Amino acid sequence: ETGNTGIGLSQRAQSFVLYEDENPYNVIEPGKRPRATLTPALAIKDKKPFLSFAVQGGDTQDQNLLQFFLNMVEFEMNVQEAAEAANVNSYQMYSSFGTHSKEAGRIVVRDDTPPWVIKDLRSKGYNVVTRKLTSGPINAIWFDHKNGTMWGGSSNFGEDYGIGW
């Protein structure tokens, strides 16, 4: 706990840096909050809950959460399709953890990404890395107000599931 604020710093305090030349945007200073990658979210539509969702994964959390949300809203996937869809991760920003490094030009894609996509990205100068998984577990509940139901969706990246009642 810090002072009399009641706020525990936990491991997220490591997101701060002490020297401006390491990362000028996240230097520790009075009144500043560390960049946090914790991402539980609740989307509201027409003043009602539309989607409750979260993802694990450190600095890729925000990227994966946005891609999941866009898969549902823009690409009209159902909650399960959106949770299982491939994600692309960029490492252009300073890391929140460890040495706070960044890897300009590095992009991670799932290993089932079509070869022509990887080739095109590499032709643009990106360092493309493929992995079996590009996201931590994604879990979500979609509120179907039209039919009075809730639908759970979860990625197949672990022993995760979405439940609503």
Predicted regions span which residues?
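In a subset of proteins, long, contiguous C-terminal domains/tails are tracked
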Residues: P115-W165
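Proteins synthesized as precursors that undergo proteolytic processing into mature forms
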Residues: E1-R131
